[in-house]
Amino acid sequence: MSLLNKPKSEMTPEELQKREEEEFNTGPLSVXTQSXKTXTQVLINCRNTK
């Protein structure tokens, strides 16, 4: 079973750490993570879609 599909409550600490690393390297937060590492600016546009 993929770590992304497995519930966090059923993961070992090692699996949780690996999943977190994957999310920061490939998920939406990867843009913010990479910009912080390279000291570049990122424009974040937030909107309320009510």
UniProtKB/Swiss-Prot annotation:
It comes from Sus scrofa (Pig). GO terms for biological process: mRNA splicing, via spliceosome; spliceosomal snRNP assembly. The modification Phosphoserine is found at S9. The modification Phosphothreonine is found at T12. The keyword Cytoplasm applies. Residues 1-36 are annotated as: Disordered. Belongs to the snRNP core protein family. This is Small nuclear ribonucleoprotein Sm D2. GO terms for cellular component: cytosol; methylosome; nucleus; pICln-Sm protein complex; SMN-Sm protein complex; U1 snRNP; U2-type catalytic step 2 spliceosome; U2-type precatalytic spliceosome. Core component of the spliceosomal U1, U2, U4 and U5 small nuclear ribonucleoproteins (snRNPs), the building blocks of the spliceosome. Most spliceosomal snRNPs contain a common set of Sm proteins, SNRPB, SNRPD1, SNRPD2, SNRPD3, SNRPE, SNRPF and SNRPG that assemble in a heptameric protein ring on the Sm site of the small nuclear RNA to form the core snRNP. Component of the U1 snRNP. The U1 snRNP is composed of the U1 snRNA and the 7 core Sm proteins SNRPB, SNRPD1, SNRPD2, SNRPD3, SNRPE, SNRPF and SNRPG, and at least three U1 snRNP-specific proteins SNRNP70/U1-70K, SNRPA/U1-A and SNRPC/U1-C. The keyword Ribonucleoprotein applies. The modification N-acetylserine is found at S2. Residues 7-21 have a biased composition (Basic and acidic residues).
